[in-house]
Amino acid sequence: YLRTAYSVDPRGWAKFDYVRMPEYRWGILLAPQEENRVIPFGEDYGKPAWQEVPGEHRAMLRRLIVIQGDTEPASVEQQRHLGKTAPSLYDMRNLFQVNVEEGRHLWAMVYLLQKYFGRDGREEADDLLRRRSGDADSPRMLGAFNEATPDWLSFFMFTYFTDRDGKMQLHSLAQSGFDPLSRTCRFMLTEEAHHMFVGETGITRVVQRTCDAMNEAGITDPNDIAR
């Protein structure tokens, strides 16, 4: 089963429930629309938030959505093989939950491209599926998402550091004057918190077990690995 968010209230509080994996479905999940929402900063500060893409910002908004969308399946491509070496059922379940939510985030970005950006958006959405992490001919757009994730320590580091950077990126997009993008990213933030939890607790467990093993072996110098 997965413990996943299924709604979020206007104050930002998410509601979670347990869903059996065969029953899990990707959906277009948006935070509730804020009545009379205005653009919070920039040259258009104080104006009503855009419900459609303004022509003068079309290319820039499409680029932001494409870059964000490109990172989501990339992390799944980097991490999916780790199920073969999961340290525990708990870790495997966390891996599955992170991966299905990253996949849903791609789905959400594709929805925006398809619904609001016409033929250009559809072509960009196709390219999101064409590119592959680490592929020599069609790599992902950002270098970090073309690196290998060979083991679980790398996975914990990724979810602790890279997903933390991703959280800041989603926070910035959640402030967008383009309201559908803002609402989409506000919901995605409810799921991103769990990804960082997986990283933080995973690293904590690794450090704790290392300290326990050193104490059991009588090692006080971490460089003294011969013993």
Predicted regions: what they are:
Residues R93-Q97, R183-R186:
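Short, charged, amphipathic alpha-helical segments
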Residues A148-H194:
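Internal, conserved structured core segments that host functional sites
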